A protein has these predicted regions:
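Short secondary-structure boundary segments
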Residues: 413
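Metallocofactor- and cofactor-centric catalytic cores in central/energy metabolism, strongly enriched
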Residues: 1-408, 417-498
Length: 498
């Protein structure tokens, strides 16, 4: 199939996207370029007067800040955020046929969930115990892991919080939810939590739940004689935990036990054309098979939230509106604006406004009905396509999704990302083939073939779905092969540091 050289995403669009560099005077699909148009950037299909809507994906993505001639380059020099965004149209929810493949090889857990990995977590309750947790994990990986080959590793879960904060309120609650979500995560075959002893975030908050005591232990460094003594004590406790976790074996599990966290970072002009909508297809397939997918990054859906609200019941829709209102207030109090989200890298890649970025970001959610909206790191209580509130900062958002129960992460990128998490494997999807080639060490699948080779989005989405099940069954991701995940646990820090 011949690849297109200019793409029009919706018949209503007043702009098209150049799929390769376009020279001044060159004509494609009836549009003659008045100036050079870089690959991934937008060209005006029609003339637009100052103040007119600039339309992409069939939605307003901005307004002309000056008169724009047909064939002109449309970007931040002549396109700006509107005073308010218009809801020009909405997608309708679709009921997709369930895919043929509906199982994976995972670890059955006592509470009915299934893990895609079998790590042992070494968790810090406070930053003061983080270095000790790192030392424990390193020593356990050196001395214990060779004896217990059915364990994926000892993962340090360390952070910079846990003290110097109030013991109540949004920030404290978010931290406790996050740590409890990791404590109970299906990808952990056992957990050891280490405190210092005098911190605000006390170990008494983290009682064992469904894990028997043989799988879950805690202690404070101050109570065992110091740092080196803590490492020795931890290894004593970890030996029986590791022996028990080593008995865990992969067995066939239904896709309904998969929970996919969806992320995008380093987006470019192709992200909303290739990787994001293709991931949306995979999300729909997962949901149709009974699984769960999580969309997040509230600042990055700003301007496109109506597309989610249209797919939700009244209560869920109101939760989304409340989240947007909270973020407007939060950003304003901290001298920021949701309107200013696109990063320099986003803009270099062809994204102009937060509305344009948001419309592409929401495409990751496919067309399935929105089944619920959850607070950051809140435990999910249903399957289907759901929304979890979070910042747009990738490691913070992914940390919350994993705490909510995600046992897989799918991460789309156009400029390039090296992200990887533990204990949930992270699949990297490139929006363009150039990135897939240049950063092949970090990319798991090339979605650029949608434009480069004319591969239909439905087929690309099916490929992603199959890869998700392969990864869930034990195939290593690029980030796992390199060893990412020890420094990517980043709970959302809300409020004052005292």
């Amino acid at each position: 199939m011949k690849a297109p050289d200019l793409i029009i995403l919706d018949p209503q669009d007043t702009v098209a996207v150049a799929l390769t560099d376009m020279a001044a005077g060159e004509t494609r699909q009836g549009v003659r370029a008045l100036e050079p148009i870089a690959r991934g950037h937008k060209i005006a299909r029609v003339a637009m007067a100052k103040g007119a809507a600039v339309v992409k994906y069939g939605q307003m993505m901005g307004v002309a800040s000056t008169d724009i001639a047909a064939g002109a380059h449309v970007h931040s020099h002549n396109c700006a955020m509107p005073e308010g965004h218009a809801e020009m149209s909405t997608v309708s929810s679709a009921a997709l046929q369930a895919p043929a493949r509906q199982s994976f090889m995972g670890y059955a857990r006592p509470d009915g969930r299934a893990g895609t990995r079998n790590f042992i977590g070494i968790m810090a309750s406070v930053n003061c115990s983080s270095t000790v947790c790192d030392a424990i994990a390193a020593e356990a990986n050196r001395t214990l892991l060779p004896k217990y080959p059915n364990i994926d590793g000892f993962a340090p879960i360390v952070h910079d919080q846990g003290c110097g904060m109030a013991n109540q309120g949004e920030g404290f609650d978010a931290l406790v939810r996050t740590l409890k979500g990791y404590r109970d995560h299906a990808n952990f075959g056992g957990v050891l939590i280490i405190g210092l002893g005098c911190e605000v975030n006390q170990l008494t908050l983290y009682k064992p739940t469904d894990w028997a005591n043989e799988r879950f232990k805690t202690f404070n460094i101050q109570e065992v004689g110091g740092s080196r003594s803590a490492v020795r004590r931890a290894l004593e406790l970890l030996e029986p935990i590791a022996a028990k976790a080593n008995e865990d074996k992969r067995t066939e599990q239904p896709v309904s036990k998969l929970v996919l966290g969806m992320q995008c970072g380093g987006s470019d002009g192709f992200s909303g054309i290739t990787a994001n909508p293709a991931l949306g297809v995979a999300s729909d397939l997962l949901v149709a098979a009974g699984g769960t997918s999580i969309l997040s990054e509230t600042p990055e859906i700003f301007g496109a939230e109506h597309l989610l609200i249209a797919r939700a019941d009244e209560a869920t829709g109101q939760k989304i509106r409340d989240m947007i209102d909270w973020w407007r207030d939060y950003a304003g109090k901290n001298g920021a604006s949701l309107d200013n989200n696109p990063s320099p890298g986003n803009k270099k890649g062809g994204l102009t406004t937060i509305l344009e970025k948001s419309l592409g970001a929401v495409a990751k959610g496919g067309l399935s009905p929105l089944a619920g909206a959850f607070a950051y790191a809140e435990k999910l209580d249903r399957t289907g396509f759901v929304y979890m509130d979070s910042p747009g900062y990738d490691p913070v958002a992914a940390t919350g999704q994993v705490a909510s129960g995600a046992n897989l992460i799918a991460f789309t990128t156009g400029r390039g990302s090296c992200f990887g998490a533990k204990p949930a494997p992270s699949i990297k999807l490139a929006s363009n083939s150039e990135l897939a080639r240049s950063m092949h060490e970090d990319i798991d699948i090339d979605c650029g073939v949608v434009v480069g080779e004319g591969v239909p989005l439905a087929e690309m989405g099916a490929r992603i779905y199959d890869l998700l099940l392969d990864i869930a069954s034990g195939q290593k991701t690029a980030s796992e092969e390199f060893g990412y995940g020890d420094n990517e646990f980043v709970p959302w820090k809300i409020g004052a540091v005292l």
